[in-house]
Amino acid sequence: MIDDNIENNEQTINDIAEDIVETANPEITELKAEIEELKDKLIRTTAEIDNTRKRLEKARDEAKDYAIATFAKELLNVSDNLSRALAHKPANSDIEVTNIIAGVQMTKDELDKIFHKHHIEEIKPEIGSMFDYNLHNAISQIEHPDHAPNSIITLMQSGYKIRDRLLRPATVQVVKKSE
């Protein structure tokens, strides 16, 4: 009889254990699914935060570059004037004039370094290259038998850009089609 009671108790314990496992299995499955869903959300949120950080860094860099655009435009004329002064230096001059020219050259070189530091590039099209309305401003057209139509024949003034943004187009003369 005791053995029967023990067997009955063991059976009851086994039945209770099975009931617990059956009851717990859906909960465990549900919890596992919830864990997977939370892991997926974490991965997506982390990626979204990373993308947002990259977008903000890019926007900050662009804002920094383009914030100086107005100031840089005003400096372009200074650079042009220094270049003109250097282009017209006398061939034979005394020491004082030579020193002044050296000072002008150093100033121009320093300005060019600052332009380079802030990604300001000179647009200086080659004679014979094709006119690009995105980078050039044609102030006149002339006929020329040795050059193709719409090619640049004269560079009047260099242009400048900051990265991809145009500060000032290069001023040019272009060849027009012969009539």
UniProtKB/Swiss-Prot annotation:
InterPro entries: GrpE, GrpE_coiled_coil, GrpE_head. One of its GO terms (biological process) is protein folding. Its main location: cytoplasm. The keyword Transport does not apply. It is found in: Cytoplasm. Participates actively in the response to hyperosmotic and heat shock by preventing the aggregation of stress-denatured proteins, in association with DnaK and GrpE. It is the nucleotide exchange factor for DnaK and may function as a thermosensor. Unfolded proteins bind initially to DnaJ; upon interaction with the DnaJ-bound protein, DnaK hydrolyzes its bound ATP, resulting in the formation of a stable complex. GrpE releases ADP from DnaK; ATP binding to DnaK triggers the release of the substrate protein, thus completing the reaction cycle. Homodimer. This is Protein GrpE. The lineage of its organism: Bacteria, Pseudomonadati, Pseudomonadota, Alphaproteobacteria, Rickettsiales.
